[in-house]
Amino acid sequence: MNNIIAQQIADQGGVEAWLHAQQHKSLLRFLTCGSVDDGKSTLIGRLLHDTRQIYEDQLSSLHNDSKRHGTQGEKLDLALLVDGLQAEREQGITIDVAYRYFSTEKRKFIIADTPGHEQYTRNMATGASTCDLAILLIDARKGVLDQTRRHSFISTLLGIKHLVVAINKMDLVDYSQATFEQIKQDYLDFATQLPGNLDIRFVPLSALEGENVAAPSGHMGWYSGPTLLDVLETVEVQRVVEQQPMRFPVQYVNRPNLDFRGYAGTLASGSVQVGQRVKVLPSGVESSIARIVTFDGDLQQAAAGEAITLVLKDEIDISRGDLLVDASAELTPVRAATVDVVWMAEQPLAPGQSFDVKIAGKKTRARVKGIQHQVEINSLTQHSIAELPLNAIGLVDIVFDEPMVLDSYQQNPVTGGMIFIDRLSNVTVGAGMIRQPLAEETAAGSTDFSAFELELNALVRRHFPHWNARDLLGGK
């Protein structure tokens, strides 16, 4: 146990009181990203060090590792606290997404340290998918680079609305205000191309020297704003799911005995209360909430993010992957959607390919109808492409094998997010953010099957009726 935790336990009157206080602190998930060697891992190490989250044995080990692998001379190489893979330490870069946890008196934090290299875009997208805020590091000597633009675009694409632009290594430019202001203006000019209403803040700092990270800098009197830690402790994160209508994807049908039948899952958005009329999709059958069951007892009301089991008044057919919504919700199941795809496989994504896809617990099959364009994520320009290569991002048309209930990703990341799974290897090969579900008539009117596909479909339906294959032309 480190000294600061021991002191907090003593101040709060024991372990139980301390644990209770920790449990009720708000949680902020954020990621650090930027160009290679901008100091992402060093910044996280500095946050852990200055908030006294490092144990004595870790600090001793860090001194030894700094002498062996360090790049900071006689100083502690704080990046070694989070660069855990041997390849990372030897190359001085981050490869994997490294998660770290720390807390202050005001808040708990989960940090995702993401790779800066372009070939690890898929790792960065994975880290960003669960975060509320992104820290974009910029080397004060280099300014806004292509990778800064790329990480900004990916962060906003994945729904992050709060961006903190940390202009690092200010010690190497003599803490110049003019340098800071120029980089700030350059980034604001670029940010006009990013989607959504963004909360962008700028902090000049030196992660290596600890300037403006957890304590104010003594060398930047011209900066009167908060430190980076102050920003993290006080930012008010508006989670989209709390303001959206009720969405409850069923993950598991809980039937421990003949007297109980409940539907377990995590409430994706909105709220639900006992007595509320709900509708099951895609069937459209309605019922009302009889009980909201949790491990700690029944609730009268539940909010987004809570893991609950819903018991309905009526016995109706519900299975894993079905979606419970408010009875007044007007949602129509669709068979097609346009999707922003981050491709994660060595083999390119191409029209005509089929994959298993998973959306909010529901697994089905989907076919790539076409690729509208690829986004050049360094310049945010769009261009036509026949195939989507590894680490590329593009807008793709998808056709599902069965009706799906979808939201756009910006409205609801749970019911608007999806993964592509290779049907042979069962490996996740892509991540998708639904931009727009397509109405049935739009999808049907734009479908263009080859003669071979139509002939094969007819043969399968004639000779293998037990497969229940759908008529591609829309017949019975």
Swiss-Prot record:
Protein role: With CysD forms the ATP sulfurylase (ATPS) that catalyzes the adenylation of sulfate producing adenosine 5'-phosphosulfate (APS) and diphosphate, the first enzymatic step in sulfur assimilation pathway. APS synthesis involves the formation of a high-energy phosphoric-sulfuric acid anhydride bond driven by GTP hydrolysis by CysN coupled to ATP hydrolysis by CysD.
Region (G2): 92-96
Annotated region (G3), positions in chain: 113-116
G4: region residues: 168-171
The reaction(s) this protein catalyses: sulfate + ATP + H(+) = adenosine 5'-phosphosulfate + diphosphate
UniProt-listed Enzyme Commission number(s): 2.7.7.4
Annotated residues for binding of GTP: 34-41, 113-117, 168-171
InterPro entries: CysN_GTP-bd, CysN_II, CysN_NoDQ_III, G_TR_CS, GTP-eEF1A_C, P-loop_NTPase, Small_GTP-bd, SO4_adenylTrfase_lsu
Pathway connected to this protein: Sulfur metabolism; hydrogen sulfide biosynthesis; sulfite from sulfate: step 1/3
Name of this chain's protein: Sulfate adenylyltransferase subunit 1
Keywords: ATP-binding, GTP-binding, Nucleotide-binding, Nucleotidyltransferase, Transferase
Coiled coil location: none
